[in-house]
């Protein structure tokens, strides 16, 4: 099995090294293409206004000046030689990708690009990393078995699997739950205003560590309960009930003011 791995934390990220070790347990044909610099929050951005530079680090390892989406597209079309990857793994992200965050995640976007190119794709993230020295031990302990089982089972061609690991001792993690995407009832993103040495204001965008109250069956609830969450996602954002509702009210001749 040929595996391509990418991430959004950058080529030197500890999570990418962890994913290389995970992939090595599943195959001896592992390729890496990841951003030269951190691209967290890049979502499905493409680099269109400037050229993308590629740095070859090894026979099967590359970094690029582009986004995770750029990396996957370049790897599949240009850099991975001989035949296409059989599986794409994106991560392991430093911090969970849950609920509405998946629409901003470069990690999930890398997997979506793989899916769009016809490669079965899995995004992997681990909760936590609020303190120095935290490791990817939970992901490294459980990801190989989960990935192997998912590959054996298969999944629809238009689906990306979003896997999130809790950040707690391995011996306390005893369950995998297949979940739906949740939605927070609190706002965790915020802008922090600061002032530079010249008296000019600037901002850092960040996240508050505030928990919501998600219902059972969601990715958020599973992680809060210390479970591994596996969420099938797809790129079709259509809200079918709203389509059916609006068809009866807006279809036909365009309305006038």
Curated annotation (Swiss-Prot):
The keyword Hydrolase applies. Its EC number is 3.1.3.5. Keywords: Cytoplasm, Hydrolase, Metal-binding, Nucleotide-binding. It is found in: Cytoplasm. Coiled coil: none annotated. It is an enzyme of class 3 (hydrolase). It holds the Pfam family SurE. Its cofactor is a divalent metal cation. Disulfide bonds: none annotated. Its main location: cytoplasm. GO terms for molecular function: 3'-nucleotidase activity; 5'-nucleotidase activity; exopolyphosphatase activity; metal ion binding; nucleotide binding. Binds 1 divalent metal cation per subunit. One of its GO terms (cellular component) is cytoplasm. It catalyses: a ribonucleoside 5'-phosphate + H2O = a ribonucleoside + phosphate. A divalent metal cation binds at residues 8-9, 40, 93. HAMAP family: SurE. This is 5'-nucleotidase SurE. It comes from Phenylobacterium zucineum (strain HLK1). The gene is surE.
